[in-house]
C-alpha cells in the first residue's frame, strides 16, 4: 500500500471517529480487556499530570478507558469497581469538546446529555478547558436505601476513589496523562448534566495525551 493511500485511509478513519463522537449516541467499540502493562509496573508509573495535549482521544482508547473506569466485567453485571451492597449508584459523565455524555456500562455506549463545549465548566484550573476529556463522577442517591442515606456519601466517595484509581492505572498502562480533582463546581454542572435533586457531583478527573 502506497503512502498516499495509507494517509487517505488514516484521514477517513479520523473523520469517521470525529463524526461518531458528534452523535447523540456513541456506540463504543468492544473494549480490550487483556494486555497492557503488568499491574506492578502500572502502579510504579501512576502519577498525576496537569499538562495535556489538545488532541482528542481515539474512540478505541475512550472505550477502553471507560470500561476500565466503570465497566461491566462479569456476566452477573458487577463492575470494575466496588459499591456498597452493589447499589452501583455512581454515574460517569464524559465531558468532551463536542458535548457531555453519560456512560451506559451495560450497553457500553455514551448518550449525549448536553451539546457544545462545556469543558471549562468542569473545573477551575486552566488545563481543564483545553484537555480532551474530563470525567465527572456523580452519585445517584435514588439508588441507595433511605434508612442509610445519611451515611452514603462516604460509601460513594470510596467507590469514586476506586474508579479514579482504575483510570490512573489505565492511563499509566497506556501512556496517558491524568489527574483527579475535587475542584469541580457541582452546582454549575447540575443544569447541563440534567442532575435532579437526588444526584450529586463527587469528583472530576482530567485525561488526555501528555503535553509535548
Where are these regions (language model features)?
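Bacterial N-terminal signal peptides that target proteins for export
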Residues: 1-9
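Bacterial N-terminal signal peptides
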Residues: 8-16
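N-terminal amphipathic, basic helical "cap/leader" segment at the start of enzyme domains
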Residues: 21-131
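Small-aliphatic-rich amphipathic alpha-helix that forms the alpha element of a beta-alpha
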Residues: 46, 65, 92, 133-144, ...
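Solvent-exposed coil/turn segments that connect beta secondary-structure elements
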Residues: 70, 97-99, 105-106, 138-142, ...
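Short coil/turn connectors at secondary-structure junctions
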Residues: 129-132, 198-200
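A glycine-rich helix N-cap at a beta->alpha junction
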Residues: 194-212
